[in-house]
Amino acid sequence: MPELPEVEVVRRGLQDYIVGKTITAVRVHHPRAVRRHVAGPTDLTNRLLGTRINGIDRRGKYLWFLLDTDIALVVHLGMSGQMLLGTVPRVDHVRISALFDDGTVLNFTDQRTLGGWLLADLMTVDGSVLPVPVAHLARDPFDPRFDVEAVVKVLRCKHSELKRQLLDQQTVSGIGNIYADEALWRAEVHGARIAATLTRRQLAAVLDAAADVMRDSLAKGGTSFDSLYVNVNGESGYFDRSLDAYGREGEGCRRCGAVMHREKFMNRSSFYCPRCQPRPRR
């Protein structure tokens, strides 16, 4: 699933190409892509026609178009969603198409059809204007108002595994499995450690590492293991070549040389160094 850096790459691409343009046509090719818009495909297309894109915003893994009608078009990429400008490699994966007044075509493709679009009202939460479906999400590490100390305070009260808390989008948004493993490796903390047992300094180090690794990923266009994540021009990111933990089972730790381990975690996998990140004793 695209995580914060990948969604931010898409947001920046859309910001450059479609802000200031007006939607002149919309076609929903697959109703499942608008299943979260409870009023249905016809309502969504009718309300989008003639609207101007005033901006593109994001929180965590969600992005949204700010429209001139004081509502937002919320986009969730799911596991395989892509926002592509121009031609697409697989027309059978196109779920929604939008045409703009200058002839630009935006296609939402989604092989697994787990993502989608919906229109939503805006509300103000803690000084930020957010679409209602996004309002429950915590600030992410790229947010100018992200407060490390405030998140540390929350984590110090959590009697569950730290990695589980990093993936909880109501604690801190935008971090997924890949960047959680990378942050924990950089901070030399095992994800199975109980959050409340860690010091403030250790927790802050993990959060700082998460922000740093995601900035590094953003600079390289994000992480692409397959064709499911690409930018708006269909190009893959290349941060996967720089991963220190995720996917490196059996390889040497880049810090100490120990063999990297993998273990099951919440129907996923966690990757870590057994020497740098010793597993807590039960």
From Swiss-Prot:
Keyword Zinc-finger: yes
Molecular function, one GO term: zinc ion binding
UniProt cofactor note: Binds 1 zinc ion per subunit.
UniProt xrefs under SUPFAM superfamilies: Glucocorticoid receptor-like (DNA-binding domain) (SSF57716), N-terminal domain of MutM-like DNA repair proteins (SSF81624), S13-like H2TH domain (SSF46946)
Active-site residues (renumbered): P2, E3, K61, R268
Residues holding DNA: H93, R112, K158
Cofactor annotation: Zn(2+)
EC assignment: 3.2.2.23, 4.2.99.18
ZnF FPG-type span: 244-278
InterPro entries: DNA_glyclase/AP_lyase_DNA-bd, DNA_glyclase_Znf_dom_DNA_BS, Formamido-pyr_DNA_Glyclase, FPG_cat, MutM-like_N-ter, Ribosomal_uS13-like_H2TH, Znf_DNA_glyclase/AP_lyase, Znf_FPG/IleRS
Pfam families tied to this protein: Fapy_DNA_glyco, H2TH, zf-FPG_IleRS
The UniProt record lists the keyword Nucleus: no
Reaction(s) catalysed by this chain's protein: Hydrolysis of DNA containing ring-opened 7-methylguanine residues, releasing 2,6-diamino-4-hydroxy-5-(N-methyl)formamidopyrimidine; 2'-deoxyribonucleotide-(2'-deoxyribose 5'-phosphate)-2'-deoxyribonucleotide-DNA = a 3'-end 2'-deoxyribonucleotide-(2,3-dehydro-2,3-deoxyribose 5'-phosphate)-DNA + a 5'-end 5'-phospho-2'-deoxyribonucleoside-DNA + H(+)
NCBIfam families xref list: fpg (TIGR00577), PRK01103.1 (NF002211)
Subunit structure, as described in the record: Monomer.
Function field: Involved in base excision repair of DNA damaged by oxidation or by mutagenic agents. Acts as a DNA glycosylase that recognizes and removes damaged bases. Has a preference for oxidized purines, such as 7,8-dihydro-8-oxoguanine (8-oxoG). Has AP (apurinic/apyrimidinic) lyase activity and introduces nicks in the DNA strand. Cleaves the DNA backbone by beta-delta elimination to generate a single-strand break at the site of the removed base with both 3'- and 5'-phosphates.
Family affiliation: Belongs to the FPG family.
The protein, known as: Formamidopyrimidine-DNA glycosylase
Protein species of origin: Mycobacterium leprae (strain TN)
Lineage: Bacteria, Bacillati, Actinomycetota, Actinomycetes, Mycobacteriales
